[in-house]
Amino acid sequence: MNKIEYFNKEIEYIKDGNNKEDIKALINILPDYFFEIPASSTGKYHPKFASTNHGLLKHTKVAVRIAHELLANDSIGSKFSDNEKDLIIMALILHDGFKSGDPKEEYTRFDHPLIISKHIMENAKKLKMGTDDMRKLCSMIESHMG
């Protein structure tokens, strides 16, 4: 499975070359189940299209597309630097990365944003981004569940 190919379009939204390389490295640490499972086992928090096989992937791609369109609109996007926009897109690609835990469990782990954040920090030496950007990225992801 070439995990990066699933996100070719979304990676193109990222402007900085180093950020593109970093998101590719981080996509490669996502578990295989991320690309196969529904976004929700109950349908309670996600639309019907995301409750099928590959639903989590679909949910993620839709979230990224909506963010990209919002950030392209000057009324919203002008408030963010290009680097901040890159980090937002990256956070959305990764936000549910370990939704079922590590290793995979039957149900959603409430702390799944903390799990992916931990994996990002553990892979810091493989990334080109600085500590401040890594903290921002992890903070965005960690706040996903409130």
Question: Which ranges hold each PLM region?
Answer:
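An active-site-proximal "capping" alpha-helix that borders the catalytic cofactor pocket
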Residues: 63-66, 109-127
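Histidine-centered active-site/metal-ligand motif
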Residues: 59, 95, 112, 144-145
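Acidic/His-rich, divalent-metal-binding segments that scaffold phosphate/diphosphate chemistry
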Residues: 1-104
